[in-house]
């Protein structure tokens, strides 16, 4: 099976998992809470969704087609309702907004944020 960009789905999933594991590594010394959250997400089906969005740059299409589902609810304590903050022009792309998504006073990945960040 291929993503919208023509890339094989398994390769996209691996990219997504790798990306999340990199985030976990980055946060490991700074915030064990976030590191644990990203590690958990890396081994869930949510990595596929992230990977497809990154690989194909089709976050708006995915959000509009309601393919995105909240993985946070399956990775407690990483649950959040998402409120986005404005970003300066160079940082206003969907991926940056996604990474800086705010939820209940904590930073957390919450897939409905994609729909709000566009």
Curated annotation (Swiss-Prot):
One example of a Gene Ontology biological process annotation: autophagy of mitochondrion
Key word Lipoprotein present: no
Domain of life per record: Eukaryota
Cellular component terms per the entry's GO annotation: mitochondrial membrane; mitochondrion
N-terminal signal peptide: none
Record bears the keyword Membrane: yes
Name of the protein described by the UniProt record: Altered inheritance of mitochondria protein 26, mitochondrial
Keywords: Autophagy, Membrane, Mitochondrion, Transmembrane, Transmembrane helix
Membrane disposition: Multi-pass membrane protein
TM helices/strands, residue ranges: 7-27, 41-61, 98-118
Subcellular location: Mitochondrion membrane
Main location: mitochondrion
Function: Involved in selective mitochondria autophagy (mitophagy).
Knockout-associated phenotype: Increases frequency of mitochondrial genome loss.
Record organism: Saccharomyces cerevisiae (strain ATCC 204508 / S288c) (Baker's yeast)
């Amino acid at each position: 099976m291929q993503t919208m960009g023509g890339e094989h789905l398994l390769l996209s999933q691996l990219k997504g998992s790798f990306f999340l594991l990199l985030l976990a590594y980055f946060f490991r010394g700074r915030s064990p809470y976030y590191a644990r959250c990203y590690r958990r997400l890396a081994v869930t089906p949510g990595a596929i969704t992230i990977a497809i969005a990154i690989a194909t740059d089709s976050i708006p299409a995915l959000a509009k087609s309601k393919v995105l589902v909240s993985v946070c609810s399956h990775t407690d304590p990483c649950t959040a309702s998402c409120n986005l903050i404005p970003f300066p022009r160079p940082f206003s792309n969907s991926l940056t907004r996604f990474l800086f998504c705010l939820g209940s006073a904590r930073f957390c990945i919450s897939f409905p944020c994609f729909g709000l960040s566009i």
